[in-house]
Amino acid sequence: MKTSTYTIPISKNNIRKRFILLNGKILIFLMTAITIFVLGSCAKKIVFPVSPTEPAAQGTILFKTDKNKNYAIDLTVKHLANPERLTPARKCYVVWIETAQNGVINLGQLHISKNMGGSLKTNSPYKPNTIFITAEDDPTIKEPGMYTVLRSESFNLK
């Protein structure tokens, strides 16, 4: 039985096109990988330890320094109960930073969604050493109350 073979003619022009296309895909992949690595290495991630008052609560903080030497803070929490369900009940959660030079500073209110998660993105000119969340009745207070929900360990940002 005779089998026929059919060969596809490959021209030099076709080989060049495939080579350029392959190199372009490799270049795009490498540029994407480098960008992800560079952007990821510029930020510092802090994870809150387990809280004795809210053991199910989990939280992470991502810090970046911008060109003006301000600290971009991206805080995310999940499994955090509505503050009205606490004992004693509170109205809101407030995020604080401790700094070496400026003491404790109120960063703002942390809003909790129906699925028990929340986030706060803000900037601070002050270098934080610790970040913590308290349950409060007034989000604009100047000093934290006694009910600390989550507290990071001390850290050192560059």
Regions found by a protein language model. Name each.
Residues 1-42:
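Sec-dependent bacterial lipoprotein signal peptides
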Residues 2-10, 42-158:
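N-terminal targeting/export leaders
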